[in-house]
Each structure stands twice: as structure tokens, then as C-alpha cells.
């Protein structure tokens, strides 16, 4: 039988910033094991040969105000592959300049890395080029998408006199996190329709026990 559960206030997940070269290199290394030089070479190919991404050697994570009117054309250019749905949704609404990604003072020689207005022919990319291109497109669309809002849940359940506790995340609005679906869908994420009702009895599906040991904290 479920006991009273607590519901935390809605958390608004902070949207990540657009990529500069250093940040892109770090994330490509973490995700794919690419060296900084390898990522730069791939970026150079996507910039010079395919012409689908902007200049890579930048230390800015912002765009200039005069680029606002070009954003929809850039979205159209990457409206294919796994981002077709997200791009289509963005194209149906007005794209307004926001200080989250527009700041003339934080752009010196070159702005953040984003898609160009050149349509991307995904079949012409190598496997590594596709990985880097997808990273940039996902970040670009995420920055322009709606915020992600979730609610933290804490549930207590009594089974044969033993009290069990569980915590989970109830996603209220997926927003930009839809572009990172694999990272969003974890075992601790539940849908609103699956939230247990207070006081209601539920059948036990399976019971499993996980054994483990605790480790002492590090010396430093």
C-alpha cells in the first residue's frame, strides 16, 4: 500500500549554451574518444568541404543580434534525419532574440558554432562527420526550444510490514531535453500517468535484491 508521497517543486532545467571549439572538443572526447585535433579536422571538413557548419576556431558561445533573422533558414537547413520533428516544431513559432544566445559583447571575431543555411546531405558525411554534425545541430535546436520542466517525487510503500522508499522524476514538459532523449530516459524517470495513487494497493510484480559494499571516502 502506498503511503503519503511528497512532490517537489517543478525544476526548470537550464539550457546549455551553444558550442565554441573548446567545449565541442571536450564533449566529443568524452562521448566518442576524439582527440582535440581530430575534432578540429572534422569541423574543418564540415565547414570548408560540406559548408554545413560555421567557422570552427571560435571562443564565443553566443551569436550577434543581426543573425536573428537567419535562424529559421538555418533550422530549415538541418530539417532532416533525427531532428526533422524538432526543427519542424521550431519553424511553426516565432524565433525571438534572447540573451541566452544573443550577445554582441560576447562575440569578438567569430560567433558560436551553429549550422549554416546550406542544406545538409547526410549521406555524404563520413561516420565521424555525422557525429560532430549531430552534436552541433542538437545543441543549436535545444537552445531555441522550449524549457524542460520536471517534478521530483518521493514515494513510500509498505510491503509485508516493511517500508520501502523510492524517488523518481516526473517530466512535466520535455522541452529541449527531447533532443537528448537517450540521456533523459533513465530508470528513475516516470511518466505522469504512472504516478501511484496515495492509499491504493498495487500488486507486486517482481522482487530482486542487489548486493553491494560501501567504500570509505577518499583521503582527499
List the predicted regions and their residue ranges.
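RNA/tRNA-interacting regions in translation and RNA-turnover enzymes
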Residues: 1, 32, 36, 124-126
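Phosphate-interacting basic helix/loop segments used at nucleotide- and nucleic-acid interfaces
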Residues: 2, 27-28, 134-141
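Single conserved hydrophobic/aromatic residue that forms the stacking wall/gate
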Residues: 2-9, 13
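Short acidic, hydrophobic short linear motifs in intrinsically disordered regions
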Residues: 14-28, 53-58, 216-220
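Short amphipathic alpha-helical interaction segments
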Residues: 34-45
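Extended, highly charged linker/hinge segments and catalytic-adjacent loops that couple domains
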Residues: 49-134, 165-170, 174-207
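Active-site phosphate-binding and catalytic loops of NTP-dependent enzymes
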Residues: 81-87, 141-149
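Long, charged, helix-prone linker segments
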Residues: 150-168
Amino acid at each position: 500500500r502506498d503511503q503519503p508521497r511528497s512532490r517537489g517543486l517543478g525544476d526548470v532545467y537550464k539550457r546549455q549554451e551553444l558550442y565554441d571549439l573548446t567545449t565541442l572538443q571536450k564533449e566529443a572526447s568524452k562521448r566518442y574518444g576524439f582527440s582535440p585535433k581530430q575534432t578540429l579536422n572534422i569541423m574543418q571538413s564540415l565547414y570548408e568541404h560540406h559548408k554545413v557548419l560555421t567557422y570552427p576556431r571560435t571562443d564565443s558561445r553566443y551569436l550577434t543580434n543581426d543573425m536573428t533573422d537567419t535562424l529559421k533558414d538555418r533550422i530549415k537547413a538541418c530539417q532532416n534525419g533525427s531532428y526533422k520533428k524538432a526543427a519542424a516544431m521550431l519553424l511553426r513559432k516565432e524565433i525571438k532574440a534572447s540573451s541566452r544566445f544573443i550577445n554582441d559583447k560576447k562575440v569578438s571575431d567569430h560567433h558560436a558554432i551553429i549550422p549554416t543555411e546550406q542544406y545538409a546531405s547526410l549521406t555524404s558525411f563520413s561516420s565521424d562527420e555525422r557525429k560532430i554534425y549531430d552534436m552541433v545541430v542538437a545543441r543549436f535546436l535545444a537552445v531555441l526550444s522550449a524549457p524542460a520542466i520536471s517534478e521530483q517525487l518521493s514515494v513510500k510503500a509498505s510491503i509485508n510490514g516493511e517500508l520501502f522508499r523510492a524517488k523518481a522524476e516526473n517530466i512535466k514538459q520535455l522541452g529541449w531535453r527531447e533532443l537528448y532523449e537517450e540521456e533523459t530516459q533513465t530508470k528513475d524517470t516516470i511518466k505522469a500517468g504512472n504516478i501511484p495513487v496515495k492509499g491504493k494497493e498495487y500488486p507486486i510484480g517482481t522482487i530482486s535484491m542487489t548486493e553491494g559494499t560501501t567504500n570509505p571516502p577518499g583521503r582527499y
